Every structure is written in structure tokens, then in C-alpha cells.
Amino acid sequence: MPQKNIIVKGAREHNLKNVDVEIPRDKLVVFTGLSGSGKSSLAFDTIYAEGQRRYVESLSSYARQFLGQMEKPQVDYIEGLSPAISIDQKTTSKNPRSTVGTVTEIYDYLRLLYARIGIPHCPVCGREISRQTVDDIVDSVLELPEGTKIQVMAPIARGKKGQFVKELESAKKDGYVRVRVDGIIYDLSEKIELDKNKKHNIEIVVDRLVVKESIRSRLADSIETATGLSNGILLVDVIDGEEKLYSLDYACPEHGVSIEELEPRMFSFNNPFGACPTCSGLSVFMKPDPNLIVPDKNLSLRQGAIKASGWNNADGGTIAQMYMEGIAQKYGFTLDTPFKDIPADGVDAIMYGTKGEKLKLTRKNEYGTGSYMTAFEGICNNIERRYKETTSDWSRAELEQCMSTVKCPDCHGARLRKESLCVTVGGINIDEFANKSIVKAIEFLDSLTLTDREQMIAKLIVKEIKDRLTFLRSVGLGYLTLARSSASLSSGESQRIRLATQIGSSLVGVLYILDEPSIGLHQRDNEKLLNTLRNLRDIGNTLIVVEHDEDTMRAADYIVDVGPGAGIHGGNIVCTGTAEDIMNCKESITGQYLSGRKKIPVPAKRRKGNGKSLKIIGARENNLKNIDAEIPLGEFVCITGVSGSGKSSLINEILYKRLVTELNGAKKVAGAHTDILGIDNLDKVIAIDQSPIGRTPRSNPATYTGVFNDIRDLFASTAEAKARGYKANRFSFNVKGGRCEACQGDGIVKIEMHFLADIYVPCDVCKGARYNRETLEVKYKGKNIYDVLEMTVEEGLEFFSSIPKIKRKLQTLYDVGLGYVKIGQPATTLSGGEAQRVKLSTELSRRSTGKTVYILDEPTTGLHTADVHKLIEVLHRLVDNGNSVIVIEHNLDVIKTADWILDLGPEGGDEGGEIIAQGTPEQVAATEGSYTGQYLKKLLNDTEE
């Protein structure tokens, strides 16, 4: 009898406290709980890890060495486990060749469609090129009215310069009598002299006929002869009518442009047969940008106007100085002339070189002064050459700071060679199809009319493409295009794309584990996602969804609530059952919010701001429709709108990149816009995202917030440390001296197991304490440095209550809801939400200038409603300090607490990019046509009740 439940016994991974849980199979199961409660530890690090490990174990040891080996999770046993597929948010491809089309494999089917039924056209004149047999040509000619006089001719030259003496002589020897040169018939016995500098059209007259059925055989022979003379091209001159051009190959009869046999690889931008030769199929390339090389044109060369690596020191006898002095002397300026006042030809010489013209360079050293003549290649050309030649990633990154991305001038961003782009299906080429939104692409396929032969060939291909496009639309991604780069997708979008791909595979009996699939999805599209999840369940799969979204919880068959708190306060199963059961569970924080017993309140009154604002004029990046947007300062501002409406384009691509360049001195190229007014009201911009605070276990909340420096100073000031002569660096695990050298301060040692997963074991010498014995002998209030790092923030607050400097920083960590996190917890073990809150606490602990703008993109990702409550309080504290906070968000609990909302839409993709509503939440809720307003209105009404 098949197992009805997945049974987990004794799960102890991370903070899980010997958890036992039964999960029904073939159901939609939601794992919920506070951020850091242990949901992901149970779902991904225990259940998925064991499912994956068991599958890998079934392979041979030879095959296993090529796969990422998975350590056995800390669990007694798991029963009823199916093969597991994880769809998380961390595997977004950053490969510039990866697109929505390639990730979903729709583009593979599309290439096959164009290769099988595509109609090639001449890249020069756009004429349709079709391959015809001799019989096809004969049938076509005999369709002319009977009695029509025709000449069968072989074009041996079309628009070519030359005298063609050999060709004409050869035709005469072969017995041909007439030739037509530039439209005039000549007898080959005549002397024909051509101007070799002019382009000529030459056709040999092979036969002259009168159309009637009896000439079929003779016509076929003449056609074969003519095409043999002219590489498969034939011209039939209809006397007193139009000429007809035919080709036996895929070649333009007029221009002779030949197209090879259509194959799927011709339409792949990852294959040299299809990729544009200029950009190698990338659609863009890096090019030196004069505006990034000289960002501040008010500076002179001596003041360091040039920021390019190797050219940023025009003083002190450097090579750069010698070249700049040579150019200055030649073009009539000095090294002290502001860059904006340098003559245009001087600027051109600095950027693009002297075009072979030599400069006089003077070299001064201790032996005297010498001069020599040399040409200058120009800074732009120098950067371009070094970029191509270097093999160092560091050098490439350094040079890229002075380069911007430009669209390929040959393929104009289409990635393919021109011959491939001249093949159409339904009147459009493959790039035009890939640039249609998914909704428009489905409409195009529905209206596509094909011949019976094409229908027979393409029926299955079109069905596969349409099914996959429909799956993408069903998960709320109808606004995306197949040409969209994977690197530009949000984590939620890329996760839903992989979800749609899984639906397309139609596997059954699989355990799917998903990580917040609703992230980045507007409430309007939530029902589509839920239907997709239900469909996956209904065909016979088990779904475990780690989720905080209330709609998803209500739609679930079963909920597992992990908690009750986070970190050391979590790791238990609070309750399990239906949404109703969770709501009735008094211990469940989730149940309290789900039932409405707890709510995030709406502020009693909205802030009016400081009267200043940022005005973005003419925003037209991606799908933005040349809009003007005003964002008030000194307020909590939410940017809302359905997925793909243009929120990230407006804030991340235009506003943030412009602000970070002007205020922070970064080298970013802002998205297309006319101007931004009001930047002088700010002094810095900070983007707080969910990226890790560090990539190694050496990074932790203490090192990131800077409190570790204060703690080390405190230990160095103890009597014992002073007696031993220990300074603060003695208490660092990153440098030699105080750390344990056996593990170099890591506390753990890696043991390579080759065919098995590598094992990390506590260091034999320090037993995981990271420091040597002498360092650990120094104590403050009975605790050594290791004991302090092992304390939670909550414990640390009490321990350091008499040290204001340390207490203040720990207090802000506690205030953002991280009281349960260890002071020295490795950054690699923090969730995205936790990392974000560490960053927020660091900002809160800084002295406020009141002129900072904070930008956050979906900060509620991974956060439980209780965590969202804390996050909102922190963000409002930043605004209370006089700063401005701009948040891109779909979470209505955050949106309802905003002072000001800017709602974009009305739809996603091409149908978005406009401002639909702006104002307070109450004003937006009253705006017809705003999807955000519709859901906000309901929530505001519920809250008032």
C-alpha cells in the first residue's frame, strides 16, 4: 500500500530541536513561521537535501564525483520521500547569453519552427527567396498566356564592374548567338566593349520560345542549360511583359545573396552559424565612455579630470603626464585648463588619439631632459585594447568602470546574423517574435495562418511553444518577452519561470519544494499562481511551499507552523493542520495574524514631508512612457504596481544610478531620462538589499556593524591584556597573533572525502573556539572573546549594559528583530531577510544627517507578518530622523503605512510604464483603474473595522 505521509523523525539541522513531523503526500503544504524560525532548515536543508542525497547515492561512485555531493542532514530518518526538485530564489542565471526563451527551452522550439517553415528573404532588397526545381519553373512559365513570346536567359553578371572579355568570348565559343548587356541585345559576333569602371548586367540568351504546351521538354532543357551557366539563377524575359527571376537555391536572383539550407543552429545566438559576428550573439558590448572617463569636466588634467586606470595621474613625471603635455602643447591648452574649456580637437586627441600624427614628448629625470616624437593611440582606444588583451578579472573590472554597454550597431540588439533575421514566419522574424510579450506571442500564434503543408510540419512545434507560453502566462509572467535577459529578472520572476518549466515537463510523483513563489507578484496575479500550484498537485505531486503570503496559506491543504520565535527561540513545530486549525492555535503567531487577532496598524496620520522633492523628468527606460514622476522627500514612499509595470526601471535603473553617481561618486550609467531635479536636497543614497553581508564565515553581524571593533578594544583595555601587552588586533581571528593557527581562526577544518561530501569538523586544537589558549585566558566579566561571540544579541545587551558604545549598536540589532542571532554568527548562515536587517540596524546606529535617501526593493521577501511589523517600525524610524525612504513593494501591510504612493501600470510590459495613481494610501484607494488601489481599499476598510 502506498505511503500516505512523509514522516520526518528527529530533525536537528541548524536550529531545529529534534523535530518530528508528518506531511501529507499529494497535497499543497505550506511551511510558515518567523524569519529564522527553521522553515528552510526543515524544507530545504532536511527534506530536500535527503531526497537529493538518496537519488545521488543510487548512482555509481564514478558518476557521484562529478555531482555536488550532499552531506547527510542531521535527521534520524525520513519515510515516504519522493525524488525531490527544489525551486528556490538563489539560482538566477547571470550569464548574458541566458534569456527567458533559453531558460524555458521555448527558444529551442522556436528555432525549429523557423528552420522548418520559415520563408527566407534577401537581406538587401527584402525579396522573398524560394527554392524551386526545374519542373516548378517550367510550370510557372507555362502559366503565361499561350502565344506569349519569351527569352530564356542566363545572368552571368549582375551589378558588377569589369569588361567581361573572357565570359563573352567563352559564350561565343559555346555557340551562343545573342547577349543582353545593360538591357540592350547584342550579337556575340560583334565587338562588345564595356567600361570597366561601370557596373553591368549581362545575360546570355539561351533560347527564344513561344509559350504552348508542346515546348515543355525544350523549355526544361533550356532552363537546365541557363541555370548551369549562372549558378542556379534564371531570367525569363517576357516580350512586352515583366521579367521573371528564378533561383534553384536559396539565393536572391537579383543580388545573388545566397542563404544556406535552413537549420535550427542558424537561429541560435549561442552558435557561430547564427550569432551576429560583430557582438558574438551578446547583443551588446562594452565600449569606453568619454563621460565615465571624465565625469567632472570642471576639473583640469592636473587636478585628475581623467579617472581611467593608468591615466588618472597627469602629474609627477608619469607617462600620462608626458602624453597630456604633448597634446596640450600641440592643441593650445595647458594641464591647468578645465577639461570643459579644452578645444574639441584636443579632446578628440585625448580620447581617440592623434590618428598617426606624432607628438613631441619630453621626459625629465635625474640624468636630464630628453624628447622624442611618437603618435598617441587615445585613451578610449587604449582601454579597448587592454580590455581585449587582459586575462585578469580584476583588470577587466577596473577597466569596465570607464566603459558603458552599447547596443550592437550591426544586429541592433537582435543577437543574430542578418541572414537569420531575414527568415520570417507569419511575416515576422524570430527576434520580432522573441520581443513580443508572452500574451502578444500567444495571440500571434492563435492568428497564424499556415498552408496545409506548413500545418502538417509545424502543428506539434506550435503546440509545444503555445503550451509553454500559456504556462508562463498562468504564473503571472505574461508581460515578459522571450528575449528578456535572465540576469535582469527578479528572484521571484526567475523562480516562477522555473516553476512554469516544471509544469511543462508534466512529471508526476515528485516532491516539489518552493521558496516563496509569490515574491514580486501583485495580488491581482496571486490567484493565477495558486491555480498553477493546484494543477501541479492535482496531477499527482506533493508541494511543500515555504511561504508567508496569507492567500497561499488559506489555499493550502495543510500548514506546518515552525517557531514559535526565531533562531534559538524557534526550531519547534508550533502546530499543524488546515488554515482554520492554525487560526485557532493560541501559541501560533501566524494564527494570530491570519485570524486578525493581531494586525499591523495604519498610522494615525500621514507625514507631510519637508516640502522638498525629487522630480524625475522624461523617464523612458525599458517600458516607461516618457513619464514625469515626483517623489516627496522626508516621507515613507512606496512604489507600487503590477509585476512588470516599470517600478524597478524607474527607481533602480534611473533614480538610484543617477543618485549614486552624483552623491556617492560611483560610476553608473543611469537609464534613459531627461533630468532629475532636487538632487541638491540630499547628501547620500543607500540601497539596502538582501544580498549577504559577507561571503565567508569570517563575516558576521559584529564585524559588519562595527561593534566587534569596540568589543576588541574593550578586551584590549582589561588589566590582563595590558599586563600581557595585547593590543586590539590580538582579539581578531583574521590576523596572526591571537587566532588559532591550526584552523586559521575558522574554528572548523575541512576534510576532503573525494567520493563523498567534504566534511567540516571542529578544530582539534582550539575545539572550535577560533582563538589560541593565551588569548582565551583574557576575560571581561568572566567571559572570554569566544564566549562573547557565542552570545545572542539579547544576551549581549545585558552583558554590555554599562558600555554605551557597544550597547547602542546591539540595541539597534535587537530593535530590528535580531535579538536571537549570535553576535558572531557566520554571515553564510543568515537568511536574506536577516542580512537586510543587519544592514538596516547599521544605518540606524549611524548619526543621521537627515539628508539621506534609502532605497529598498521588496524588503519583505522572506519575512513573516510579525517580522514585517518590525521592519515597518524600523523604516519609519529612519524617516522620523529626517531621512527619506523609497520602497518598491507589493506587500499591502507595508503599502498601507506609507505617507505617499506612486502606482505604475496599468499592466505589465508594453501596456505598463505609466503613472496610474499617486498620493496618500487613501487617495490611491479611491482611484479607479488602479489595481493596487482596489486591494488597498479593501484592506483599509478591514483595518478600520
Whereabouts are the PLM-identified features?
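Conserved phosphate-binding elements of NTP-dependent enzyme cores
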Residues: 1-945
